A protein has these predicted regions:
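Extracytosolic ligand-binding ectodomains
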Residues: 1-174
């Protein structure tokens, strides 16, 4: 009846509501959320009630806090810089970084496929699929992609970091 921790398995700003309600009712245990809340609106809606919350997230969320030895840091920072140049400082979206990563993966695969077949042909589509499934060590903003015919996600442990919300900010937890 008095758990040590609560996992709110939600996404987006609505995931702040159960946590705010538990705080109002006096729950003082730990809070965990999912990567689905890794956006500035969650922080805005949750306010101080979401401080001290832990969540796993893509490394891009805390790119500037990653150790320089982290292989994703450079690409994640490049995404953040490009996104914020277009949309303003502090506007970065982890969700947009998934699209960025997809672009990097398809660019690498298309570069390989075009060497084997003419674009627009069935042969090219087959080569593109083969190249996608042969993707190795493509560094994105969320992780490093290594795909196969059986793994179309291609991400491993390097694709997530633990983050804590501290005073309304995302803080990397090594």
């Amino acid at each position: 009846t008095k758990p040590d921790a609560v996992l709110v398995a939600g996404s987006g700003t609505p995931a702040a509501l159960p946590q705010k309600t538990l705080k109002e009712r006096g729950y003082t245990g730990k809070y965990y959320q999912t990567h689905g809340v890794a956006n500035s609106d969650f922080l805005r809606v949750g306010g101080k009630d979401v401080d001290d919350t832990y969540l796993p997230a893509g490394p891009v969320l805390v790119a500037d806090q990653l150790p320089t030895s982290n292989p994703v840091r450079k690409t994640a920072l490049a995404y953040v810089a490009a996104y914020e140049a277009a949309h303003g400082k502090g506007s970065v979206s982890t969700f947009g970084a998934h699209a960025w990563d997809a672009g990097l993966v398809i660019q690498a695969a298309a570069t390989a496929a075009v060497k084997k077949a003419q674009p627009g042909t069935p042969a090219f589509r087959a080569e593109l699929r083969n190249a996608l499934e042969a993707t190795k060590e493509v560094v994105g903003a969320h992780g490093i992609f290594n795909m196969s015919a059986n793994d179309h996600n291609g991400l491993d442990q390097r694709a997530r970091v633990m983050v804590k919300i501290v005073k309304g900010n995302w803080v990397y937890q090594p």
